[in-house]
């Protein structure tokens, strides 16, 4: 359906936004493949990108480097485009422990996953929207380059129903089962259907409250209605409805037969290879596991871990590029890579990490070699599948700059705020000097961020400041999400005035009350003192009209020189603009929100075993379970499979005793 993108906003582009929009649109219309938008912190990059989408009218994929950032972008874009399809596509695992084998201890860890039903619904909503309309924006995490089923199969297996169409009721039921819908007359939920005489109700995989009621008269569809699944209230009459498959890995029966033959062939070859090499245990293992999966596929049409056979199911040759979300888009689409200095390296790294784990499973007989083809795209494959890309970052990386030497800049903030001035002061006597600066800020009811290089220095500095009566807190890597949000909130509310940390570049640290950022050991070259990190850190003081940065250093390194020069260049552009238009910089006014939803902090393992489960109260048990689940997710994320499996077993015991 041809619908136009339209922005709903009380604001119009300001500052250098109109020029950036014009240049980006011009580049896209003239066929430029890659462009870079260098947008300083707080300049309204999302609003600029929204205007570009509105002007070029192309389906757009916005990629972010984590779920938190993707969630923020999704909310913002949904506000700008309330009448268009803004969709969300991230990994649907709340907790995902991939199957893994640890040869040293002969430990096989089964895949264990907890799927978030809401996110699964949003993923189906995203893919079906791409086949139903043109005005689609999908906000995705980098996991969108992971393998997905074939878009051709997904499109061809759509069950299309129209009023007046001749169709036998039982034929419709068979078609629904073929696209992985289950009949359930009692527990009616997403991905199921129920039958009452001549009425069939279908709960599409992409909806969460509405279902479709099909009323038959003989062998003809008499009426199609959209109904509230809970109350039965009729919401709308429909002439036509398209029911998309309930799984992205759907395969027609004839293809499934060919796939099963090919899997059997591969199994025979692999068994011969393993037996010839004297790997009898591995041969027995792979035969047992694969034959069980094949039996399930013959009987049920699917099996647990069916994605590992995706190469056979889509009849692709070995080593072929897998299908991903990118294949569901039409040919002429736009990709926006947000925070590209992080997301581009992330796309590069995905493939190698995945292959390393799967290779161990293949070598030890847990998976057939074809499982290696259920994988994310390599960087070159990703490049081939992209049409036109806009890289967005305050500090674009070397790859983006090499791809698009002409950078489009967005330096001016709608609030008139300037990049902060930078002082360089000697390391000797830095703490006493810093103490004086902190006291000045406290007197004005402003806040201070201090970044150090080591955990020890952070702890020592925090202790020292506490001893001299400063209200201070320390943000380190062990602080989990929920605590972190609370710490930032308390800093904004003035429960303490100074926040010390090592890496202050993570999201959520744009705090308008902060007027001083102090960088200790600024002259020690390295990851957190590279020019990009320094520019991003300096940006933390750009939300306050009195913002200032102090670098404590005995020499000016190359990175410091570049960061200082770039900040001064941006500041002079901003000052000239403010002078020309008579703008007075004003600190951003941003309400302090309560913590809405996040993960509880997880404690060290020994604290779990300190209180025997039998002696715990119900509340204590629930609290411990929540903490352990959080740590289990963290362990799986950090690829610490043994720890995750150990926690999973502890959890099962706890739940059983509850």
Curated annotation (Swiss-Prot):
Subcellular localization is given as:
Cytoplasm
- List cellular component terms (GO): cytoplasm; excinuclease repair complex
Which residues belong to any copy of the Helicase ATP-binding domain? Answer: 26-413
Domain UVR, which positions?
622-657
Q: Where is the motif named Beta-hairpin mapped on this chain?
A: 92-115
Q: Output the InterPro entries linked to this UniProt entry.
A: Helicase/UvrB_N (IPR006935), Helicase_ATP-bd (IPR014001), Helicase_C-like (IPR001650), P-loop_NTPase (IPR027417), UVR_dom (IPR001943), UVR_dom_sf (IPR036876), UvrB (IPR004807), UvrB_inter (IPR041471)
Q: What PROSITE patterns does this protein's entry cite?
A: HELICASE_ATP_BIND_1, HELICASE_CTER, UVR
Identify the residues that the record assigns to the Helicase C-terminal domain, covering every copy: 430-596
Major location (coarse): cytoplasm
Q: Which UniProt keywords apply?
A: ATP-binding, Cytoplasm, DNA damage, DNA excision, DNA repair, Excision nuclease, Nucleotide-binding, SOS response
Task: Tell me the domain comment.
Answer: The beta-hairpin motif is involved in DNA binding.
The subunit field of the Swiss-Prot or TrEMBL record says:
Forms a heterotetramer with UvrA during the search for lesions. Interacts with UvrC in an incision complex.
This chain belongs to the protein called UvrABC system protein B
- The source organism is Bacillus cereus (strain ZK / E33L)
């Amino acid at each position: 359906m041809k619908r136009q993108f339209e922005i709903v906003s009380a604001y119009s582009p300001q500052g250098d936004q109109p020029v950036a929009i014009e240049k980006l649109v011009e580049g896209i219309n003239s066929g430029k493949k890659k462009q870079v938008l260098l947008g300083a912190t707080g300049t309204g990059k999302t609003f600029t990108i929204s205007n570009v989408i509105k002007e070029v009218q192309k389906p757009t994929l916005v990629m972010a480097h984590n779920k938190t950032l993707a969630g923020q972008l999704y909310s913002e874009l949904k506000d700008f485009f309330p009448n268009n399809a803004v969709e969300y596509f991230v990994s649907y695992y709340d907790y995902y422990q991939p199957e893994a084998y640890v040869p040293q201890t002969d430990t096989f860890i089964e895949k264990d996953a907890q799927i978030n039903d809401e996110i699964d619904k949003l993923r189906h909503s995203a893919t079906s929207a791409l086949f139903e309309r043109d005005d689609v924006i999908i906000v995705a995490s980098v996991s969108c380059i992971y393998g997905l089923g074939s878009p051709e199969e997904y499109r061809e297996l759509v069950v299309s129903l129209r009023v007046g169409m001749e169709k036998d009721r039982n034929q419709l039921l068979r078609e629904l089962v073929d696209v992985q819908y289950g009949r359930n007359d009692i527990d009616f939920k997403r991905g199921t259907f129920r039958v009452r005489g001549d009425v069939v109700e279908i709960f599409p995989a992409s909806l969460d409250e509405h279902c479709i009621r099909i009323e038959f008269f003989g062998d003809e569809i008499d009426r199609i209605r959209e109904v509230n699944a809970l109350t039965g209230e009729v919401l709308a009459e429909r002439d036509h409805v398209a029911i998309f498959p309930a799984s992205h890995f759907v395969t027609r029966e004839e293809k499934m037969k060919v796939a099963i033959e090919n899997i059997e062939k591969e199994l025979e070859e692999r068994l011969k290879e393993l037996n010839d090499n004297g790997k009898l245990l591995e041969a027995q293992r792979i035969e047992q596991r694969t034959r069980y999966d094949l039996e399930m596929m013959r009987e049920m049409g699917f099996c647990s871990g069916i994605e590992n056979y995706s190469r056979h199911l889509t009849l692709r040759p070995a080593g072929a590029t897998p299908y991903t979300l990118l294949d569901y888009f039409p040919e002429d689409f736009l990709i926006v890579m947000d925070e590209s200095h992080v997301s581009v390296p992330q796309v590069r790294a995905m493939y190698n990490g995945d292959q390393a784990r799967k290779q161990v499973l293949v070598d030890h007989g847990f998976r057939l070699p074809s499982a290696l083809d259920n994988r994310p795209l390599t960087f070159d494959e990703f490049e081939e599948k992209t049409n036109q890309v806009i890289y967005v970052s305050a500090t674009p990386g070397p790859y983006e700059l090499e791809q698009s030497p002409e950078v489009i800049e967005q330096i001016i903030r709608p609030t008139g705020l300037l990049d902060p001035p930078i002082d360089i002061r000697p390391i000797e006597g830095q703490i006493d000097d810093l103490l004086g600066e902190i006291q000045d800020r406290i007197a004005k009811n402003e806040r201070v961020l201090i970044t150090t290089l080591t955990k020890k220095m952070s702890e020592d500095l925090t202790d020292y400041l506490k001893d001299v009566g400063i209200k201070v807190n320390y943000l380190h890597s062990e602080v989990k999400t929920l605590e972190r949000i609370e710490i930032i909130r308390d800093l904004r509310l003035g429960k303490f005035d100074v926040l010390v940390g090592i890496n202050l570049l993570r999201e959520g640290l744009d705090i308008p009350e902060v007027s001083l950022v102090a960088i200790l050991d600024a002259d020690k070259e390295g990851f957190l003192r590279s020019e990009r990190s320094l520019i991003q850190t300096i940006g933390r003081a750009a939300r306050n009209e009195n913002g200032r940065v102090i670098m404590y250093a005995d020499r000016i390194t190359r990175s410091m020189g570049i960061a200082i020069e770039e900040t001064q260049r941006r500041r002079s552009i901003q000052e000239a603009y403010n002078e020309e238009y008579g703008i007075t910089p004003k600190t951003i006014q941003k309400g302090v929100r309560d913590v809405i939803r996040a993960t509880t902090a997880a404690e060290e393992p020994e604290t779990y075993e300190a209180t025997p489960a039998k002696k715990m109260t119900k509340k204590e048990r629930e609290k411990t379970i929540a903490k352990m689940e959080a740590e289990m997710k963290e362990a799986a994320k950090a690829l610490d499979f043994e720890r995750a499996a150990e926690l999973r077993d502890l959890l099962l015991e706890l739940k059983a005793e509850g």
